[in-house]
Amino acid sequence: LNTNVNLSAPVGVLCFLGACFVMAVLGLVALHALVVRRFGRARVTLVLLAGVLAVYFGLILVFSLASGERVLARGEEKHFCEIDCHLAYSVADVRRAKTIGDGAGAATARGEFYVVTVKTRFDETTISPRRGNGQLYPNPRSLTVFDDKGMTYPVSEEGQRALADAGSAGTPLDTPLRPGESYTTELVFDLPPDAGDPVLLINESDLPTHFIIGHENSPLHKKTEFKL
């Protein structure tokens, strides 16, 4: 299973919440000690706080260095493990075009448009029988294309607008799903002619994910990307 973590997601989230709680308590104890002028207690508490920070960020570094980069082929899925690994993403198709749309609503690429069809699927095998058939709302996603020179390319606003005007943008990525459901989304990127070996990175855009042990958004963690 290709995922966006290399530590069990519930463990990573619990470690994050636990570390935040411990650091908050130690911070309050240190603040109180300073207010009542118990400087010895404040010093010890701050040393403990620094120790917790060092251990936590040390664990982030260990799991990041143990991670590996993966480039997925057409149709291979990447599961997003936010707590449970319910949502799976894959690249279903890629087509190239110089122009998207017709008439006044058309958009012309500076280089070449890559129109990427991304499939989102709620993997029903990842749920328990007790979960039911309720909808799942995807968290915000960040989508970026990288080439072999390390250059980055965001979604083209002009190309995306032209695709939407033509009625070909598909289903928005934040559309909720029920178990077993799937949909496709068309995303446009404007790449220069010399962009070699482009890959698409789909990841979470929430800030706290950068501080979760084993999450691909954490510092130095390798990524799981899609070949275009």
Task: Give the role of each language-model region.
Residues L1-L14, G18-G27, L31-A66, S142, ...:
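Surface-exposed edge beta-strand/loop patches
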Residues S64-V71, G132-L136:
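Short linear motifs in intrinsically disordered
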Residues E69-R110:
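Low-complexity, acidic Ser/Thr/Pro/Gly-rich terminal tails and inter-domain linkers that flank the onset
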Residues L87, Y114-V116, Y183:
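Hydrophobic core residues within well-ordered beta-strands of beta-rich domains
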Residues Y89, V118-T120, L187-F189:
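Preference for bulky hydrophobic residues occupying beta-strand positions
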Residues A92-K98, K119-T125, N203-L207:
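Generic short beta-strand segments
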Residues A97-V115, S128-G134, D174-R178:
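Short, solvent-exposed beta-strand/turn "edge" segments of beta-rich domains on protein surfaces
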Residues A109-T125, N139-S142:
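A short beta-strand signature
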